[in-house]
Amino acid sequence: MKKIGGFVYPWGNGHFTRMMHLDKAIQDTMKDDVQMHYTSSGEIYQKLLQKFPQNKDRIHNIEMPTPIDGKKGPSITLSSLNFLLPMSGRPPLLSVVTNYLRKEGNLYNNQKFDLVINDGDVGSNAIAQRRNVKCIFITNQFRPKLWASRFYLYPGVIYVSKNIEKATKIIVADSPPPYTICEYNLNFTDKIKEKVVYVGHFSNGGIVHSKPKSDVEKLIENVDSFGYWMITGNKSTKKITLENYKTSFNSSEMTKERRLISHASSDSSLDRVLGKDGKTYSFAEAVEKKIDWIQIDVGFLSEQEKDTVLNLCKYAVINGSHTAMGEILGGKAKPIIGIPVYDEHTNQIKWTQDRNLGILATTVKQTVKAVSLIHNDYNRYQENLSEFSRNYNTGGTKNTVKIISEMLEN
């Protein structure tokens, strides 16, 4: 039996989500031939323990270097100071990096992996190369374009890309060109293009609606149109996103615009319905009284509810997450309004805007205007989305499993 090590970077949920889609494909096709180990830290480590309660001995906790949260994404100032100084309850980053590389190296020595799969963990690429272990790196960025305000991050981008280069195979979790959402985040050098494979998006496949309709689904099924406003990211990012949304809703142009806000938080106290009468209702009460609503707030949507929302909404407002963009643009053929947090998001939304699949909005005023533009030119967006959706490749996990099998055989 072959042993595979999966190293999951703990910043955000995207790396974890992608790896779990891949794990399912591995278990469906190779479970009798491979033994999976996973390594991460923090919240993602806890999620791995919950996901694999019978295999806790194969889940390894190694603290990986991550930025410090700021008001909107990572704090550049605090993260820079943290390189040599303790900051926000964290030890100096230099000591974290040293311990992280040492512990991952020891894990390699102890487990004798036949293959490693790294999603976001570039340090593991370097360790694998030094130990002559075959290595796959899964990504949607290599040398992303930096906007003028972030030029000082360029040395870090070069450092990360040089470690990505050390992988045996670089897997891009996106459709091949010219339908690559993350195109502006790649910019591969000629010397490594031969090891790059565009495998397709790591989709979880179609959602089977096996449960009775929830109150949320009942509330949205017979309305004329509404927007799906997603709140994702770390705590501080969620807070500022919600504040921006509220400011947008208070503008005169938005007084009649229906919206469903998903808070991505398992806090049922967030669940409420705002009627056009200005009163607030519970979900059950709103359904029973057939309330004509203007806003629905949901703490957490089930997979079935999310699928229903995406099927019925007219557009989605998101931060530019690669996974979410693929699901909405490709899977559901719905236009997006993108409000970016990172340059990675800005690049992906800009790519979308350049192809008339959505709109980039960096201010509240632009967000409000974007809603109007989508309503006024909806048919044009639908035509472009129809072509993009036809070429949306969802075979990422299946194609990656084929590559894994070939690398293990060779």
Predicted region positions:
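A short, glycine/small-residue-rich beta-strand->loop->alpha-helix junction that serves as a flexible
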Residues: 8-20, 236-239
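Conserved nucleotide-sugar phosphate-binding/catalytic loop shared by glycosyltransferases and other
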Residues: 34-95
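Conserved nucleotide-sugar donor-binding subdomain of glycosyltransferases
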Residues: 77-118, 122-123
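A donor-sugar binding/catalytic signature common to diverse glycosyltransferases
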Residues: 116-119, 303-348
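Active-site-proximal region of nucleotide-activated glycan assembly enzymes
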Residues: 130-203
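Donor-nucleotide binding loops and adjacent catalytic segments primarily
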Residues: 204-315, 346
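C-terminal alpha-helical cap of glycosyltransferases
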Residues: 393-410
